[in-house]
Amino acid sequence: MIDQVRAHVAEKIKELDGVVALRQMGDGAVAPYLFRQGDNLSQLTLEPLYPLALTVSLLQKQFPQARLGIVARGCDARALVEMSKREQVDAERLYLLGMACSAEKAGQCYCADPAPDPAQWPAAIVIGEPVASAPPNPMVAEYEGMSLEERRAFWQAQFIKCVKCYGCRNICPECFCEACALEDPLWVEPGLLAPDFPMFHLIKAMHMTSRCVACRQCELVCPADIPLTVLYDLLRRDIGELMGYTPGLVLEAAPPLSLTLEDATIKSELV
């Protein structure tokens, strides 16, 4: 797939101001990079899993007239869908070069949408053969088999490990508030480790309602190995069942929490 991606970037970059992708650096490190025409595309790489949506957002804000491309996995594309709805990226100025993740990669992430949907974008292509949805995270079913008291004990045991490094917030493509409630002393006491249970993580979870696109970066970067995606998978499921909305799925679908109750009717059988 890497050869196909490089070849397509080499062709499309003639029409664009640059393409955001991962670059293999001379010291062996990998970092986001804005490839321009004439750059050495042999340095373009697809691994490791790295979120690029925030990089595109920053570049579009810095260069509002530029037309950029992005080499995007399904999770990147879903993140960009939600960011577009909240005016963090301009979909009209973005060319999406999607790549379909393998069944193995999808399984590692429990990914329900392992390839971008090109139909959602003004200009897009997908390289690779899309695979079926991966099985869901088994920890979710295990959690749902617990009693309420067991669930509380589960989260207490997990959140007590939190060192408040803000890694989950910093990596999240849907966290872009200029003033973060997680840094407000009114809600989160400074210098307290672990943060008060359950305020810190429930504030973030509340803000991610109808936003979380299951990229799982929050869990991957957590130095304490807190299974955050159990919480967010449950949020995504409830929003889907209650409001018929799946974050990151449809570019034109309005986020339910931005609508009135008349426009976003809660399913009566669940009320």
Please place each PLM-identified region on the residue numbering.
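Ferredoxin-type iron-sulfur electron-transfer modules in oxidoreductases and energy-metabolism complexes
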Residues: 139-159, 174-271
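Iron-sulfur-associated redox domains of electron-transfer enzymes in respiratory
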Residues: 1-161, 169-178
